[in-house]
């Protein structure tokens, strides 16, 4: 144990440059690293946890917290993780972690080979959990992806409704009965919105049996079964032409080695005047590798790509990238809402699962919020067409589409004014709140 202590002691002595980290080791000794504020405490209570923190901290910190062998002292897990991230960014990463990061980078393409059976197992790992769990921290529509906060003052329900309208505007749903394919349709919220509010005919495909059952029930209860259907299907099995394709929060599960096939599938599926919109988590600091704890416990086989990693596949497919938008802190705000709701319902969630599971989810939500605030992650939305002239030459039509749906929600036929006119937050909130309350 002495050698493990020495190695971790040396790594922390080098890393901590901002604030003070007080570490209590398994032998009862306490060492302080750095100086000044903030002052953060950490207890490592077992030799196993100490060994893990020495040789594989990217995995061991989360596992130790789940098992109660690593605990924040005098602070929250969020505060501890933020402290460590800030110091890793400025003081340098743990030397063993740098070596493991290189190894993860070297084998990342192998880790992301996701044939259909493996993709199904990966999805079941996270999405086929007790549906009541997600109802306790997501919005009423169960949108498990980045919301859209134009002012930052929106409620979670408002921001998720705005996200769906923002995406719908980019799909240019300019006539009724457009056939839409929703890849990774989740609990059905996007598909139901496109059918109800835009007159589309939507097919949602998912690999989650739990989500499929909920989505079908919601469509029936909403009286939309004639316009929306949901299927248990891998995207690679789809072979029918459609007018529009939307995919929100699914692309992270495709895998690097499958990007060419994914975008070729989009091109082959879209009709000549078709439009696709892909919304996914990405990284602003270039290609990387998935954290080992996230890969093991939360999203096996998943990866959040930089835009530079997807564009070669887009270009090879022959599709036009007609619009790319980077959403920076929107997901951090989304997850902050989820964390607060999870904390408020923690006892009820524990009754459905177990304490270790609750700790896992607490660690997950805290860590993921922080990578969007501190560690270069963001969301990107990319709009794609087959033809160069499918869409107008400027983005004004998107604003007009969002203005139109706000007008409908307020019971008006239109909102007066030309393209580019500012819609007051109060007016938008009235519309979105009314819409969100009806979901």
Give residue spans per PLM region.
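Conserved SAM-binding loop of SAM-dependent methyltransferases across substrates and taxa
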Residues: 187-198
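Conserved beta-strand signature within the Rossmann-like core of class I S-adenosyl-L-methionine
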Residues: 273-281
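A short glycine-rich, Lys/Arg-flanked "PGG" loop and its adjoining helix->strand segment in the class I
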Residues: 260-272
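Substrate-binding/catalytic lobe of Class I Rossmann-like enzymes that use SAM or dcSAM, i.e.
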Residues: 281-392
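A short acidic, Gly/Pro-enriched loop at the edge of an enzyme's catalytic core
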Residues: 236-245
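Conserved SAM-binding loop
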Residues: 215-216
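Conserved class I S-adenosyl-L-methionine
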Residues: 176-184
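Feature captures hydrophobic
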Residues: 1-160, 166, 173
């Amino acid at each position: 144990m002495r050698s493990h202590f020495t190695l971790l002691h040396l790594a922390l002595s080098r890393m901590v440059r901002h604030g003070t980290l007080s570490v209590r080791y398994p032998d009862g000794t306490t060492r302080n690293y750095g100086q000044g504020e903030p002052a953060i405490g950490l207890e490592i209570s077992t030799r196993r946890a100490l060994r893990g923190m020495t040789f594989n901290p990217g995995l061991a910190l989360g596992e130790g917290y789940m098992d109660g062998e690593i605990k924040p002292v005098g602070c929250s897990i969020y505060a501890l993780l933020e402290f460590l991230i800030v110091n890793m960014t400025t003081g340098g990463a743990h030397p063993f972690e740098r070596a493991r990061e290189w190894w993860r980078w070297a084998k990342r393409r192998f880790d992301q080979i996701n044939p259909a059976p493996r993709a199904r197992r990966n999805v079941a790992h996270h999405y086929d959990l007790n549906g009541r769990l997600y109802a306790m921290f997501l919005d009423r529509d169960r949108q498990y992806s980045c919301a859209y906060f134009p002012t930052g003052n929106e409620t979670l329900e408002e921001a998720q409704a705005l996200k769906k309208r923002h995406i719908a505007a980019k799909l240019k749903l300019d006539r009724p009965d457009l056939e839409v394919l929703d890849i990774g349709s989740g609990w059905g919220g996007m598909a139901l919105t496109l059918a109800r509010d835009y007159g589309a005919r939507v097919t949602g495909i998912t690999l989650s049996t739990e989500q499929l059952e909920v989505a079908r029930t919601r469509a029936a209860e909403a009286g939309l079964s004639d316009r929306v259907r949901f299927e248990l299907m891998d995207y690679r099995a789809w072979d029918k032409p459609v007018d529009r394709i939307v995919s929100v929060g699914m692309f992270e599960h495709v895998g690097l080695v499958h990007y060419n096939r994914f975008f070729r599938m989009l091109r082959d599926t879209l009709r000549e005047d078709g439009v696709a919109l892909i919304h996914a988590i990405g990284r602003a600091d270039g290609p990387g590798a998935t954290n080992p704890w996230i890969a093991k416990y939360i999203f096996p086989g998943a990866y959040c790509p930089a835009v530079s990693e997807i564009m070669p596949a887009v270009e090879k497919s022959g599709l036009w990238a007609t619009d790319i938008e980077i959403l920076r802190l929107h997901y951090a705000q989304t997850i902050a809402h989820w964390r607060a709701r999870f904390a408020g319902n923690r006892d009820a969630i524990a009754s459905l699962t177990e304490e270790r599971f609750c700790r896992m989810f607490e660690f997950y939500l805290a860590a993921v919020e922080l990578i969007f605030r501190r560690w270069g992650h963001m969301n990107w939305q990319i709009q794609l067409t087959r033809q160069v002239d499918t869409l107008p030459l400027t983005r004004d039509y998107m604003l007009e589409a969002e203005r139109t749906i706000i007008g409908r929600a307020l019971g008006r036929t239109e909102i007066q004014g030309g393209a580019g006119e500012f819609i007051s937050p109060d007016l938008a909130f009235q519309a979105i709140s009314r819409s969100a309350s009806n979901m």
